[in-house]
Amino acid sequence: MSLLHPNRPSTTQAPHLERLAPRAAIPGGSFEIFGSHLLSVTNDGPQITPQLPAAAFGDTTAYFDLVRPTRALVRVPEGAIASDLTLRANGALSNPLHANIGVPMADELHLVANPAIDADGNLFAMISGPRGERTPVSIVRIGRDLQARPFARDILNVTALAFGPDTYLYASSRAEGTVYRISPEGDHISTFAEGMGIATGIAFDRDGNLFVGDRSGTIFKVGPYGSHNPGEVFVFATLEPSVAAYHLAFRDDGRLLVTAPSTSSNQSIYAIAPNGDTSIFYQGLGRPQGLALDTDGNIYVAASLHGRRGIVRITPDGSNAELFIAGNDLVGLCFLDDGCAALATASTLYHLDLGITGRPLV
């Protein structure tokens, strides 16, 4: 009861946190908090004044995008790590909830698609550069010690990376319409296939065929290295053009999933059957980009869903989608060999423990 207004009950209660959504975030992304007494009020004369709580991830102060009594959006600040989130209001501290937060593992990159991982657990990422401009280093290798070292040079505008069944790294160049084949030590680079327009996303099927997305409307199929037709290019399917790049990933059933980001907020993931027939697998995303799958067949795609950006998880049958990781500027991801994931923004790779096993890519 208020001492100034004895007939008015006191509204000061400790905030109570029930759950957080989504499952994880990177700095710049926001967690949605569900609970009670998140927004307290004080009796100040005849007025009831809302009092914003203070939020912290561990010892790192955080700020709100929105606060209501039972729901709030709190933004993950730079420097935050996986820790307990608490709210404090009028001297009362909430119960803690663990917040899973990704931490930077490499920066000063120019990422336009998924990173790639080799059989030894090394991670590879591009420094793509502005169109038509070469960068001093084209691809970096990030070892288990999290040290980034130059891996390949002199590839113009690297746009996608994928490991082939021959253990070589393949890289597309959107400026040249070419896919390059790079030896495991990065000391030998050769042209594998060329003449593919604005070559962007790449992926291998189980037979070792390479699929390349020309963002102007064509998916090419390229004969595998070591076959009777290595590097030979065929038209596999056609799609609506993309303003940026195609991103490709294979399902266990042999269907090729493709995103083709544009300016629409209601975009699709396409599924292309082995015979080239194309259908819409899921619709309702904003600017979908890099995608990956887990061993259960769930699809993870860098996209916006209902106005929030991050990694969206879609069920294997395409019937349901949810924001799984919150983060602005995300362009792709890949699963590592220890249940963790590498998340790519335009300039930084983040490491995040998810406890998820990714689908083998070849």
Label each PLM-derived region with a short phrase:
Residues S2-L93:
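Immunoglobulin-like IPT/TIG beta-sandwich domains and homologous Ig-like subdomains
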Residues A92-G102:
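Edge beta-strands of extracellular beta-sandwich domains
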Residues N100, I142-Q147, I182-D187, V222-H228, ...:
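Short loop/turn segments that connect beta-strands within beta-propeller blades
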Residues N100-D107, L146-A152, D187-A193, G231-L239, ...:
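A short beta-strand motif characteristic of beta-propeller blades
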Residues P136-V140, G177-R181, T218-K221, S268-Y270, ...:
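A short loop-to-beta-strand structural motif that recurs across blades of beta-propeller domains
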Residues G143, S173-R174, D214-R215, A273, ...:
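Structural signature of WD-repeat beta-propellers
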Residues E322, C340, A346-V362:
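Flexible, glycine-rich linker and terminal segments associated
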